[in-house]
Amino acid sequence: MYAIIEVGGKQLLVKEQEVIFTEKIEGNAGEKVEFDKVLLFGDKVGRPYLEKVKVIGEIQKQSKHKKIIVYRHNAKSTHKRKLGHRQPYTRVKILEIKG
């Protein structure tokens, strides 16, 4: 079975025993997390969310993506600005879908 959950403002299609990458979730590696914002499960559609359906996952890793460089330059002056950004993410393994 599969489900569509809402995590970090994004909708993700998940299946059991699948690994997903989400926006940063509070918690350490090895802890279990529960996603209760389930939009779709099998042939059931929520309005907006399904009650009594939960997705259980385990945090595998907290990390950051590769650095992106943001460079701003004003053409008619000597103003330049170079910034770097690394977006944090969480790797989660989906253990089961209850519902």
Curated annotation (Swiss-Prot):
Pfam annotation, one family: Ribosomal_L21p
UniProt keyword list: Ribonucleoprotein, Ribosomal protein, RNA-binding, rRNA-binding
Any one cellular-component term (Gene Ontology): cytoplasm
Residues spanning the membrane: none
Listed GO MF terms: rRNA binding; structural constituent of ribosome
GO biological process, one term: translation
InterPro entries recorded: bL21-like (IPR028909), bL21-like_sf (IPR036164), Ribosomal_bL21 (IPR001787)
Family, similarity comment: Belongs to the bacterial ribosomal protein bL21 family.
Protein name: Large ribosomal subunit protein bL21
UniProt organism field: Mycoplasmopsis pulmonis (strain UAB CTIP)
Gene name, Swiss-Prot/TrEMBL: rplU
